[in-house]
């Protein structure tokens, strides 16, 4: 990677149990650190507008915070129940939201319950108030020991940006010259979209978090980040998805207790490289469920996923990009990210892209590293069999596609495909794998019984040469 770092000598990226420096070696000058950030627990005191909860959930996801409690003015709980609920949540930050002046008394009562429930918590949670000035003054009078700050309406883009900025400031915890990993990834996605003059989706899975970022060529970026991962946060994936939903992606019969022990071992050995095919299959399964739940949470919070699904470029980073085979990275992304058109999927192994994004996030000039194009993915659901034409340096190949098809066509040199029903003609330079035609349908479903599920997974894995032969 060629990088102009100005006053920064190197970028140091923190992982679960190690740090990587780019460029490697001793730093002769200032070091910019990239960190995951601290866990921030957010509680919400809500007025009667039903859109407030969704707007706050969207803001919390964008800021990488955990939304641990929602308490409404009309939720039916008693004063003591509200106080106990907030005490158990142990929030670092409380956001009070009201758009209707009729909510003033109810919101002040919630603030009183907060003071009652969290009186012994140290430090006391800061309170961000997105409401009329008179309501903010009454909340300040009810909670004199808490720090009170004003916040714009979180239902607006400006309000969400202000909330995200405040959440990220708390996550840094005054750790000096640092950039949060999700900040760096968003800056990198923005730079890639501007350079490519096309929408870009970046999927990042690490041991402790998962990010889905959609960047447009006009510089607009929407990102969601959640503490679901394949290492220290693997148990959170299992808690959210359930062990059966993780196990369903493993192409062999595995007893639940043995699989659960492997999940918890991942937290004991952060950044460990999978030592067996089963361990690798588990990491891939956890990555699938982590991405799927982040997307589901984003949709529930009001984020429209249609523009992201239509993006022509998808880039994989983190542990997802460091899987031993490119086909492994590809199939994880394909199984859970439902693209609606032809997509060029690439991966950026290592930390060069994160380092470039960190520099860009701090206003430094950085040249993006080269990423590795894996495949052009053509997702289809034809009513009747259709023909896809693929042109590369060897000539033209015609592939007849019917529902349920899942095939890889190896290519050489510059590749262009022509699909029925669209004028878009994806084109790419040398691809590591080739063109993948996916007519499995969406949402992707697996048979519940092992006798049907395992052959289905084996067929999909064999099509892309995903796993070694002993598990097929």
Whereabouts are the PLM-identified features?
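Conserved phosphate-binding catalytic cores of ATP/NTP-utilizing and phosphoryl-transfer enzymes
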Residues: 1, 27-38, 71-89, 116, ...
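Gly/Thr-rich phosphate-binding beta-strand-loop-beta motif of the actin/hexokinase/Hsp70
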Residues: 1-21, 41-44, 83-103, 192-219
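Short glycine-rich, Thr/Ser-proximal phosphate-binding strand/loop in the N-terminal lobe
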Residues: 3-5, 9-26, 64-69, 220-236
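Short beta-strand-loop/turn "lid" adjacent to the catalytic site in phosphate-handling enzymes
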Residues: 28-53, 321-325
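Well-ordered mid-protein domain cores that form the structural environment of catalytic cofactors
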Residues: 45-97, 101-103
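Short acidic, S/G/P-rich loop/turn micro-motifs used as interaction or catalytic elements
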Residues: 49-51, 76, 99-105, 134-135, ...
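Internal, well-ordered domain-core segments that constitute the primary functional module
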Residues: 82-159
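Helical "lid/coupling" subdomains associated with nucleotide-phosphate turnover
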Residues: 177-202, 206-472
């Amino acid at each position: 990677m060629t990088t102009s770092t100005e006053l920064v000598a190197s970028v140091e990226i923190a992982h679960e149990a190690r740090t990587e420096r780019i460029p490697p070696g001793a730093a002769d000058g200032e070091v910019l650190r990239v960190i995951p950030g601290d866990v921030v627990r957010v509680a919400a005191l809500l007025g009667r507008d039903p859109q407030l909860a969704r707007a706050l959930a969207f803001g919390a996801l964008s800021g990488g915070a955990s939304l641990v409690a929602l308490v409404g003015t009309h939720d039916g709980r008693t004063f003591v129940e509200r106080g106990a609920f907030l005490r158990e949540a142990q929030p670092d930050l409380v956001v009070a939201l009201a758009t209707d002046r009729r909510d003033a008394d109810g919101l002040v009562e919630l603030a009183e319950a907060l003071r009652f429930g969290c009186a012994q918590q140290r430090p006391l949670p800061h309170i961000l108030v997105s409401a009329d000035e008179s309501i903010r003054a009454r909340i300040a009078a009810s909670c004199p020991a808490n720090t009170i700050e004003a916040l714009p309406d979180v239902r607006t883009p400006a309000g969400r940006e202000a909330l995200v900025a405040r959440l990220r400031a708390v996550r840094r915890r005054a750790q000096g010259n640092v950039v949060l990993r999700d900040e760096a990834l968003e800056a990198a996605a923005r730079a890639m979209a501007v350079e490519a003059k096309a929408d870009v989706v970046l999927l990042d899975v690490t041991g402790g978090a998962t990010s889905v970022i959609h960047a447009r060529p006009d510089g607009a970026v929407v990102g969601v980040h959640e503490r679901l991962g394949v290492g220290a946060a693997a148990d959170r994936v299992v808690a959210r998805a359930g062990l059966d939903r993780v196990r369903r992606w493993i192409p062999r019969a595995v007893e639940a207790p043995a699989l659960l022990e492997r999940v918890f071992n991942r937290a004991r050995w952060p950044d460990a490289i999978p030592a067996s095919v089963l361990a690798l299959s588990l990491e891939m399964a956890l990555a699938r469920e982590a991405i799927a739940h982040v997307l589901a949470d984003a949709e529930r919070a009001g984020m429209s996923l249609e523009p992201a699904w239509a993006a022509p470029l998808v880039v994989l980073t983190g542990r997802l990009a460091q899987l031993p085979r490119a086909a492994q990275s590809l199939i994880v992304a394909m199984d859970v990210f439902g693209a609606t058109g032809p997509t060029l999927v690439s991966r950026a192994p290592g930390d060069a892209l994160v380092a470039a994004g960190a520099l860009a996030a701090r206003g430094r000039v950085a040249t993006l590293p080269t990423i590795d194009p894996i495949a052009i993915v053509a997702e289809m659901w034809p009513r009747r069999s259709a023909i896809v034409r693929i042109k590369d340096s060897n000539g033209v190949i015609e592939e007849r596609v019917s529902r349920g098809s899942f095939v890889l066509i190896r290519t050489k040199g510059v590749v262009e495909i022509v699909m029925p029903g669209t004028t878009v003609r994806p084109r790419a330079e040398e691809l590591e794998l080739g063109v993948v035609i996916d007519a499995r349908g969406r949402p992707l479903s697996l048979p519940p019984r092992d006798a049907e599920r395992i052959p289905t997974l084996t067929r999909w894995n064999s099509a892309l040469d995903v796993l070694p032969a002993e598990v097929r």
